[in-house]
């Protein structure tokens, strides 16, 4: 009995990457339809003056293992499955025809490639080399992007809507941006009138980029402070009180066997953050660990609130924006999860 059409890879735990349930050829016309559909979705959903966004989100756009991000006039691509890798030259050609970028940079790296039997690959695949800093616009702010050396493809595009939400609630507030990377949450908050923004990250390079972004948005130095520190230690040692805290850590759970240790980490940072919030204070807490489902993440924050002896309300569950669609049949694509919490009076 025929089920569908996809690519088979005997070397990987995911042996089949299904492309269609229909009896149709996987040819140029098929791939073009999928790419054009993804592009049309972004054109319809993206806020105006947004020049950094995800154009193709793998399984979420029914193109397994394929990621394309737009940063101004440049594209960054990832071919994270053998099925996507087979289509590389065809997909790049179509991207050029559709968007006319100045250059396309491939950044196909990580353990997923290894499992698929592929080597890590990084470098220009079409056109010009991206400059060391690319400027994009988002939420009325400018951000410098480091494609070659930055985290992920250069920026955490999946947090755009959540940055806008935090910014809208930050006027006159004292905000702590934990695991700040290039400062996104804090910069949007400062643009919206935050009274004070403290950005904490363990990476000197990330904080240097955050300072560049701060200056690039003409924000006053008297409002912002950038601190290089381990976030766990900072939360335990600081005596400063904040009105809004954002926790957007790297994944504490990269493998299933890391779940127990990772849950302890999430509980600890949320517990310590809740200690620093006054009644009415807001906590935006995120996890990008694929192996931690939302129900377990919420339970972890519940235990943190109990140990901190704080009464806490859930105001909203948080997810990526519409440029990161999730295939209903691919729950693993729902990696980023967050919760907006309020400390009770």
Segments from the language model and where they lie:
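Conserved SAM-binding loop of SAM-dependent methyltransferases across substrates and taxa
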Residues: 182-195
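Mobile active-site "lid"/loop adjacent to the S-adenosyl-L-methionine
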Residues: 242-272
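Non-catalytic accessory regions of SAM-dependent methyltransferases
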Residues: 1-72
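S-adenosyl-L-methionine
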Residues: 205-246
């Amino acid at each position: 009995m025929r089920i569908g059409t996809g690519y088979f890879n005997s070397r990987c735990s995911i042996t089949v990457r299904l492309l269609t349930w229909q009896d149709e050829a996987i040819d140029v016309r098929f791939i073009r339809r999928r790419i054009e559909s993804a592009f049309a979705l972004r054109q319809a959903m993206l806020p105006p003056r947004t020049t950094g966004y995800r154009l193709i989100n793998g399984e979420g756009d029914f193109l397994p293992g394929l990621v394309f991000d737009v940063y101004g006039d440049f594209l960054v691509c990832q071919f994270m499955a053998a099925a996507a890798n087979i289509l590389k030259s065809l997909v790049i050609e179509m991207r050029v025809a559709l968007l006319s970028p100045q250059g396309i940079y491939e950044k196909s790296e990580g353990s997923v490639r290894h499992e698929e039997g592929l080597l890590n690959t990084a470098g220009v695949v079409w056109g010009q080399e991206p400059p060391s800093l690319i400027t994009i616009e988002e939420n009325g702010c400018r951000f410098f992007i480091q494609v070659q050396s930055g985290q992920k493809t250069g920026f955490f595009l999946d947090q755009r809507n959540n940055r806008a939400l935090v910014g809208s609630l930050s006027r006159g507030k004292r905000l702590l941006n934990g695991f700040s990377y290039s400062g996104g949450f804090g910069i949007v908050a400062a643009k919206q009138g935050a009274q004070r923004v403290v950005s904490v990250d363990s990476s000197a390079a990330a904080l240097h980029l955050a300072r560049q972004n701060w200056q690039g948005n003409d924000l006053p130095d008297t409002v912002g402070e950038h601190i290089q520190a381990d976030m766990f230690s900072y939360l335990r040692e600081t005596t400063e009180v904040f009105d809004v805290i954002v926790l957007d850590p790297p994944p504490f759970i990269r493998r299933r066997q890391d779940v127990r240790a990772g849950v302890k980490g999430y509980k600890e940072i949320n517990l310590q953050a809740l200690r620093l919030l006054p009644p009415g204070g807001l906590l935006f807490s995120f996890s990008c660990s694929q192996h931690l489902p939302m129900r377990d993440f919420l339970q972890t924050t519940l235990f943190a609130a109990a140990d901190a002896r704080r009464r806490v309300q859930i105001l909203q569950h948080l997810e990526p924006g519409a440029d990161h669609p999730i295939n209903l049949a691919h729950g693993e694509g729902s990696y980023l999860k967050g919760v907006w919490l309020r400390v009770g009076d």
